[in-house]
Amino acid sequence: MACMTRVLFLSSLRLFAGRGMRACIAVLLVLLLAGCVGSPFDASSDSESEATPDELFQTHTDRVATLGMRKNLDALYRLMEKLYRRNPAEWRKSGAPNAQVAGQRIRWAVEQHQPLRELGSRSDIAALAFTLGPDYRGDRVGGFIYALGSMLITAHDGQTTFYMTDMLNAQYIHNAARNMEKASWLLANRKDPHGRPWLLSNEMSVQGQNLSYAIEFGKIVARLDLLTEVLDESGRRMGVSYAQSLLFMNFLPVQ
């Protein structure tokens, strides 16, 4: 941003400079633009990754949806790690030797569309409230994250990667964002019969504040809302383009 600001400043100076000064400024502009082009991006940015053959079959919206899905699932797995650290008794219920192995089981079940034995036939929204209720006896952290992950994938038509032939429903994505907000509230407020949280998460005390769980949920919701807007705009533009083609009755060249 600072680099481009300097470019714009030098460009404006050319309007008022003499011929010799304009030549000097032109040289400076070339050098500065070269520096702008060579400036590295944030290492965490997906724009630095190499293009893959699959991207030839993806529209801009498909790419946004694919990247958003990956980031959202990764955010859920980070939440799972945090929750296991604060609630170690939960991963032990799964029979796994440690939290990492317990987490791998949940991740595999989410991405391979496999059911969790302790949830029976429940998945996505049917499993959400159940995992934070008195009748659930399994790993609450794993069950909760599995429910959220399967809900996300269901809202995206059962897929995690998207291509030109795929049609995402903006309303389902919007609903998934609202479900995430409700899940965040349930996590913070659902308590057992003794008044204790089913799962320890956000904390505000005299020792300090830990709102990292709410922040992670907020990022997921923001990405889902952005995708909803992108899908709505894509559909609107398709309708406008079709109407324009009818209005102007443009014929296509045949030679």
Functional labels for PLM-detected ranges:
Residues 37-38, 245-255:
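Long, compositionally biased low-complexity regions that are usually intrinsically disordered
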Residues 37-140:
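N-terminal Sec/ER secretory leader and immediately downstream segment
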Residues 22-27:
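Sec-dependent signal peptide recognition
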Residues 93-228, 232-246:
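Mature extracellular/secreted ectodomains of secretory-pathway proteins
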Residues 32-35:
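C-terminal motif of bacterial Sec signal peptides marking the signal peptidase cleavage site
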Residues 1-19:
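N-terminal secretory signal peptides that target proteins for export/translocation
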Residues 13, 17-21, 137, 213:
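Structural motif marking the loop-to-transmembrane transition
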